[in-house]
């Protein structure tokens, strides 16, 4: 993107943001890329590049052999816990606290909790969280002991539920599982109330989450996409700001403050 094109992108985004009072921010893995967390879809460095998703992210795989999955998710939780919110996360939190808007809501596909750690208070997790755990059988919550492996390990036995003896599992949504109904309903409601949607760092190919921006489009909500590359959602966006979250969102805040 040329310098002039970048200026135009900022001007357009700022113009839309100035007129909006209720903001819906829809984020994916690219949101956390500048925090050092690899995206799932990156062909060269993606977290899935050397791992079969069906082997580490399906309920069937968990039922067959939970130890490799427990080891992997505990390691991932440690990686996420050591990461820091980037400038993009901080910018959204700043926006929420500014007097230019009434409300900023985040619907995220991420499971790293970096939005909350940056200070955002209204975050809906479509795919759960690395830091929430429950019994596989009775759903009793398990308090995280934060004893995370420092390096990936092949196998680790999940702890057992004190109530029923079932295995403790990560509180994330796997292939073969439904998205949480309450979170989905909240996301739909916030989109219904929004007068601007910002899409950040998502490929738009993970369903049903990818259908949410289409709801905004159907309502006539202006959509700004922030992504280094064009995605499946670019066609429904009013325009795509070809940049990263850590670059574009602070630039947007500076534009609003000018």
Swiss-Prot record:
Gene3D superfamilies with a match to the protein in the record: SIR2/SIRT2 'Small Domain, TPP-binding domain
Top EC class, one word: transferase
Known EC number: 2.3.1.286
Keyword set, alphabetical order: Cytoplasm, Metal-binding, NAD, Transferase, Zinc
A matching Pfam family: SIR2
Active-site residues, as the UniProt record annotates them: 127 (proton acceptor)
Principal subcellular localisation of the protein: cytoplasm
Domain Deacetylase sirtuin-type: residue ranges: 3-258
Stored InterPro entries: DHS-like_NAD/FAD-binding_dom, NAD-dep_sirtuin_deacylases, Sirtuin, Sirtuin_cat_small_dom_sf, Sirtuin_class_III, Ssirtuin_cat_dom
GO molecular function: histone deacetylase activity, NAD-dependent; NAD+ binding; protein-malonyllysine demalonylase activity; protein-succinyllysine desuccinylase activity; zinc ion binding
Record's catalysed reaction(s): N(6)-acetyl-L-lysyl-[protein] + NAD(+) + H2O = 2''-O-acetyl-ADP-D-ribose + nicotinamide + L-lysyl-[protein]; N(6)-succinyl-L-lysyl-[protein] + NAD(+) + H2O = 2''-O-succinyl-ADP-D-ribose + nicotinamide + L-lysyl-[protein]
Disulfide bond sites: none
Residues holding Zn(2+): 135, 138, 161, 164
Domain of life: Bacteria
Transmembrane segment boundaries: none
Binding site for NAD(+): 28-48, 109-112, 201-203, 245
Signal peptide: none
Record carries keyword Phosphoprotein: no
Family to which the UniProt record says this protein belongs: Belongs to the sirtuin family. Class III subfamily.
The record's note on its domains: 2 residues (Tyr-73 and Arg-76) present in a large hydrophobic pocket are probably involved in substrate specificity. They are important for desuccinylation activity, but dispensable for deacetylation activity.
UniProt cross-references to NCBIfam families, sorted A to Z: PRK00481.1-3
Annotated protein name in UniProt: NAD-dependent protein deacylase
Origin species: Corynebacterium glutamicum (strain ATCC 13032 / DSM 20300 / JCM 1318 / BCRC 11384 / CCUG 27702 / LMG 3730 / NBRC 12168 / NCIMB 10025 / NRRL B-2784 / 534)
Protein's gene: cobB
């Amino acid at each position: 993107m040329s310098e002039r094109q970048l200026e135009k992108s900022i001007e357009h985004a700022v113009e839309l943001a100035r007129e909006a009072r209720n903001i819906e921010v829809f984020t994916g893995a690219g949101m956390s890329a500048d925090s050092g967390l690899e995206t799932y879809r990156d062909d060269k460095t993606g977290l899935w590049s050397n791992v079969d998703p069906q082997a580490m992210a399906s309920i069937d795989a968990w039922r067959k052999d939970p130890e490799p999955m427990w080891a992997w998710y505990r390691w991932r939780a440690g990686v996420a816990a050591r990461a820091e919110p980037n400038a993009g996360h901080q910018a959204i939190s700043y926006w929420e606290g500014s007097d230019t808007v009434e409300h900023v809501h985040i619907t995220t596909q991420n499971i790293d909790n970096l939005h909350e750690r940056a200070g955002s208070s209204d975050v809906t997790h479509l795919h759960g969280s690395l830091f929430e755990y429950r019994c596989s059988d009775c759903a009793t919550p398990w308090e995280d002991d934060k004893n995370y492996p420092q390096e990936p390990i092949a196998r680790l036995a999940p702890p057992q539920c004190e109530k029923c003896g079932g295995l403790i599992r990560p509180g994330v949504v796997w292939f073969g599982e439904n998205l949480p109904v309450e979170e989905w309903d909240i996301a739909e409601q916030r989109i219904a109330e929004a007068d601007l949607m910002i899409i950040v760092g998502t490929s738009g190919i993970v369903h049903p989450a990818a259908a949410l921006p289409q709801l905004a489009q159907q309502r006539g909500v202006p959509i700004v996409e922030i992504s280094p590359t064009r995605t499946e959602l670019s066609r429904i966006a009013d325009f795509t700001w070809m940049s990263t979250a850590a670059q574009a969102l602070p630039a947007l805040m500076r534009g609003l403050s000018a």
